Structures are given as structure tokens and as C-alpha cells.
Curated annotation (Swiss-Prot):
One of its GO terms (biological process) is translation. The gene is rplW. One of its GO terms (molecular function) is rRNA binding. Keywords: Ribonucleoprotein, Ribosomal protein, RNA-binding, rRNA-binding. It comes from Prochlorococcus marinus (strain NATL2A). One of the early assembly proteins it binds 23S rRNA. One of the proteins that surrounds the polypeptide exit tunnel on the outside of the ribosome. Forms the main docking site for trigger factor binding to the ribosome. This is Large ribosomal subunit protein uL23. PANTHER family: 60S RIBOSOMAL PROTEIN L23A. NCBIfam families: PRK05738.1-3, PRK05738.2-4, PRK05738.3-1, PRK05738.3-2, PRK05738.3-4. One of its GO terms (cellular component) is ribosome. InterPro entries: Nucleotide-bd_a/b_plait_sf, Ribosomal_uL23-like, Ribosomal_uL23/eL15/eS24_sf, Ribosomal_uL23_CS. Belongs to the universal ribosomal protein uL23 family. Part of the 50S ribosomal subunit. Contacts protein L29, and trigger factor when it is bound to the ribosome.
């Protein structure tokens, strides 16, 4: 674990990514999260294991390129994001969608 996130592991994971590809990966016990761009794989592993009380087997990270955006004559770039695909051990799961109670 890097010293940057040593005392604040909750800042590593920003939000889960819900896309068609990420939803299909749930069947393989893989969960996709948007994480802080400065986070390393040991930081992500420690954060997921602490926050969700699960065993992580592997992590794949991606730094997709930033996209350009224009508003009128002003151009800029979207913020940098980092994606992490976390593979959990058999029998572990993360509850991303709350159970709906029928009334």
C-alpha cells in the first residue's frame, strides 16, 4: 500500500461503474469501479477488502484517454479517470443493487 492512501482507504474507490460490459462481468464475480487515478493496485485491493469485507483474487486497472469537450468556443478536457476490475474469490459477492421490497 502506498503512503498516500495509507490512512484514507475510503477515498480510493469513487463509485461502481454500471455498464453493459460490467454487468456481464458480474456473472464471473468481477466488479468494475472508478478509482482515484493516483491509486495503485495494493491500495485498491486494501480498500475493497476493508469496505466490502471480501477476498480479492486479482485486479486489472485501465487509464482510458481523456476526451475533449467544447462549450461554445472554449475547449477543455474531461477529468482523468481510472477504472479497476476487481475479481473476487468464489463465494464472495458485493451487493451493488439494493433488494427491492414489494409492498
Amino acid at each position: 500500500m502506498t503512503k498516500f492512501f495509507e490512512k484514507r482507504l475510503t477515498d480510493v474507490i469513487k463509485r461502481p461503474l454500471i455498464t453493459e460490459k460490467a454487468t456481464k462481468a458480474l456473472d464471473l464475480n468481477q466488479y468494475t469501479f472508478e478509482v482515484d487515478p493516483r491509486a495503485a493496485k495494493p491500495d485498491i485491493k486494501a480498500a475493497v477488502e476493508k469496505m466490502f469485507d471480501v477476498k480479492v483474487l486479482g485486479i486489472s486497472t485501465m487509464n482510458p484517454p481523456r476526451k475533449s469537450r467544447r462549450v461554445g468556443r472554449f475547449s477543455g478536457k474531461r477529468p482523468q479517470v481510472k477504472k479497476a476490475v476487481v475479481r473476487l474469490a468464489e463465494g464472495n459477492s458485493i451487493q451493488l443493487f439494493p433488494e427491492s421490497e414489494e409492498a
